[in-house]
């Protein structure tokens, strides 16, 4: 892990290696937050690395891209979100995330949440947020990324 100057010297940044097969398809930046989206060659996984403050505007742009991605699909796909670098999220985000249910080809929504407290909070919103699987460890995240990296068109 390396130090992140934006958050001061006491906060360490997440430095997991994304498998080479992944292709960056979109970067959404706001003043305080960012979402970078990648897909595997077979387009069966859309992977999002979120960081900073996840505002309603940032989330709305992300969900618009996810919806466009879904419309371009003819096969089932998985949406995997890494929240390790999220510092704060707007309290209404769970209501917006409920829109994920409207994607016809989305078969699974997986979220990596390293914090036990945040996993508990997300479980409390279980009826609002359609999370199919919550990952606790970086190893679980890396395993899913590696499995999907091996898939070909």
Residue ranges of predicted features:
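Amphipathic, Lys/Arg-enriched alpha-helical "gate/interface" segment within cytosolic domains
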Residues: 2-153
């Amino acid at each position: 892990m390396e130090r992140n100057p934006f958050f001061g010297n006491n906060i360490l940044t997440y430095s997991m290696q994304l498998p080479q097969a992944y292709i960056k398809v979109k970067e959404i930046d706001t003043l305080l937050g960012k979402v970078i989206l990648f897909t595997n060659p077979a387009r069966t996984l859309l992977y999002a690395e979120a960081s900073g403050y996840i505002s309603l505007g940032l989330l709305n742009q992300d969900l618009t891209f996810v919806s466009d991605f879904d419309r371009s699909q003819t096969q089932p796909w998985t949406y995997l979100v890494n929240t390790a670098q999220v510092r704060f999220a707007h309290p209404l985000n769970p209501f917006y995330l409920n829109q994920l249910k409207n994607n016809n080809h989305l078969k699974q929504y997986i979220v990596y949440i390293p914090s036990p407290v945040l996993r508990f909070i997300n479980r409390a919103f279980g009826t609002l947020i359609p999370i199919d699987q919550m990952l606790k460890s970086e190893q679980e995240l890396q395993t899913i990324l590696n499995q999907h990296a091996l898939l070909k068109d």
